[in-house]
A protein has these predicted regions:
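Acidic, negatively charged sequence signal
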Residues: 1-22, 36-113
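Short, acidic, Ser/Thr-enriched surface-loop or helix-capping motifs
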Residues: 25-26
Length: 113
């Protein structure tokens, strides 16, 4: 029985709310594809660069969670995945929510307990 092939790198994409900027990045945080509409130039280079960095960070978080799942399917023990710092799917969702709150502020009047 052969083990499943694990890709050398995991990649994920993140898109801004308006769908005008998309970044694909590796689990190492390296952007491998950046696409944006020409209209984004109107906000200036610093704003466009900041949006690209934000989306790179978000896609890297998703890619790291995807990488964890790939390695787990290949038989890597949970303890090793934890030591590698690869987040679980839920931890990735929590981190993305935290980033959203930092970007937009709290979206609920309810207090976290």
């Amino acid at each position: 029985m052969t083990r499943p092939q694990v890709p050398a790198v995991a990649v994920a994409a993140a898109t801004n709310r308006s769908g005008t900027v998309t970044v694909r990045a590796t689990d190492q945080g390296m952007p491998v594809e950046i696409r944006f509409e020409r209209a984004e130039y109107r906000y200036g280079a610093p704003a466009l660069a900041a949006e690209m960095l934000r989306l790179t960070q978000r896609s890297a978080i998703v890619a790291r969670a995807r990488r964890r799942e790939q390695l787990a399917e290949a038989g890597v023990p949970e303890a090793m995945l934890d030591r590698l710092g690869l987040p679980t799917r839920q931890a990735a969702v929590d981190e993305l929510d935290r980033l959203d709150d930092a970007d937009t502020g709290q979206t609920s009047w309810l207090r976290n307990r």
